[in-house]
Amino acid sequence: MTEHKNNKKRLLAWLLLAAALVLAAAALGMARFGMGVWPYPVAAAAAVLLIVAVAFLRPNWAALAATLASLAFLLRFAARGYAWWGYALLFVAALVVLHHFLPAVLWKIVVILTCIGLVYFCVVESFIIKNARTDADDGRDYLIVLGAAVYGDRPSLTLVRRLEGARDYLQQYPDAVAIVSGGMGPGETVAEGQAMYDYMTAHGVDPSRILIEDKATSTEENLVNSFAIIRERGDEPQGKVAIVSSAYHLYRAKLFAQKFGVSDAAGVAAPWGYFFVMLNYFIREAFGVTHFWVFGN
């Protein structure tokens, strides 16, 4: 009787695993052909089925590593905004494999290096989190809004939240002028700066209070070009600039501002989005900050 039950559980587990693979393939296809939000719930359902199947199978190390790698694959390719969760799971899967194959001495070295890496990661995140807030409470003259993805001519959700933060600031400080900064990237039919201008004017912001910068393709260029616009107006950015961006991005944006001589740029944190998506970008930002510390850009 027990063996019969175990066989039924194994059969159910393999059926669930097959269903998970079908749903995963469907999610990837939907994402590939741009089918709106549908890839996300389908990918989530695939992940749930995969986890349940693994629970039934009671996996050995190889099955556990394969499961983690499969979940990482789903998060990386089928769920927009969760790629760095996928990388994290892939790293854990690699640790599972290394634990099985490495001699004890080498495994201890891997554990020590991993712990050092985690401590370093926490240190970097402390700087990012400390600056992930609005500190522009003194009415700066210029508000630089950093661009983000545009789908065709439509601002992404991340960019919309930045624009909402900028609009709120302009309402609070009626003498401030916004500089919307961003060039045209892949898949975009208008420059990000123009898309931001169109969105803000359509949502009640006076066009005379918005200056367009439409050439920048990076945070560095956003700030260099925006500072140049301020100087062309006969002004200096020092003491007069606030930067609008996603909360996780403000620390690095301020580092770039300091690099170009504006040591007191304030930050305006855009409203937060989905919690786990935001955590994904906080994870990613640690690598961006590290790149700046090492290479200066």
Residue ranges and their predicted role:
Residues 2-8, 53-60, 100-110:
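Membrane-interface helix-boundary motifs at transmembrane edges
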Residues 11-14, 60-64, 87, 105-115:
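Alpha-helical transmembrane segments of integral membrane proteins
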Residues 1-44:
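Membrane-anchoring hydrophobic segments
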